[in-house]
A protein has these predicted regions:
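Histidine/acidic-residue-rich, glycine-tolerant segments that coordinate divalent metal ions
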Residues: 68-78, 85, 103-202
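Short, glycine/acidic-enriched loop or turn micro-motifs at the edges of active sites
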Residues: 59-61, 83, 145
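Acidic/His- and Gly-rich active-site-bordering loop/insert found
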Residues: 2-79, 88-103
Length: 202
């Protein structure tokens, strides 16, 4: 996966690879949910309880500069947020659950495209994800470089960073060059705003 990254909502080959893997583990697989989303289900025992385990699998539009055997083969596209790792971990967990079958109920492996552009989850949900594949809870995770091997962090509520888009509109006011005090200079206001906002984190 790391060698063959695909951008958000372009993950056709990655989705095929994932579907083939979970089919080989014995899961019932549904593809094309919200375009490239995948749900793989496995029922064991007689319980009506079900859980979802979720991972994302899109890459970023960034050039990888590492010189490693598994370096991205695509110019300007790379798995630099670790979504290949997330999917690999979920595939490994899915394989383990299928081999051991040490649970009672249904496990659903949810593979989400387009996390980086915030398109994948809404697309899957709008396509009936939870109506077609009801679950009592969904568990997800994100890699965190710097943790020791085998460590996990848990918390209630939000954790790690998120991306939101918002806009600020600055409205200037023109004036005569001899009377600048009667105007509002949007360039000065915008420059001050950029510096003030950046000072929040630096």
């Amino acid at each position: 996966m790391h060698k063959n990254p695909e951008l958000s909502m372009q993950e056709e080959e990655t989705a095929k690879f994932i579907a083939d893997q979970v089919k080989s583990f014995g899961y019932k697989v549904e593809t094309g949910i919200g375009k490239y989303g995948i749900v793989a289900s496995l029922k064991v025992g007689d319980s009506d309880k079900s859980i979802g385990l979720r991972a994302d699998f899109d890459a970023l539009p960034i050039q990888e500069v590492n010189d490693l055997p598994y370096k991205s083969k695509k110019e300007g596209v790379a798995h630099l947020c670790g979504h290949d790792g997330h999917t690999s971990m979920l595939l490994a967990a899915g394989k383990y659950l299928a081999e051991t079958r040490n649970f009672n109920g249904t496990v659903r492996l949810i593979f989400q495209p387009a996390e980086e552009t915030m398109e994948g989850a809404p697309a899957m949900i709008d396509d009936g994800l939870f109506e077609k594949f009801p679950v009592d809870a969904v568990f997800g995770m994100h890699n965190m470089p710097g943790l020791k091997l085998g460590q996990f962090y848990f918390t209630d509520g939000e954790v790690m960073a998120a991306v939101d888009n918002w806009e600020i509109e600055i409205t200037g006011k023109g004036s005569h060059g001899a009377m600048p005090e009667h105007g509002i200079d949007p360039i000065v206001a915008g420059s001050s705003l950029v510096m003030a906002l950046q000072s929040i984190v630096s």
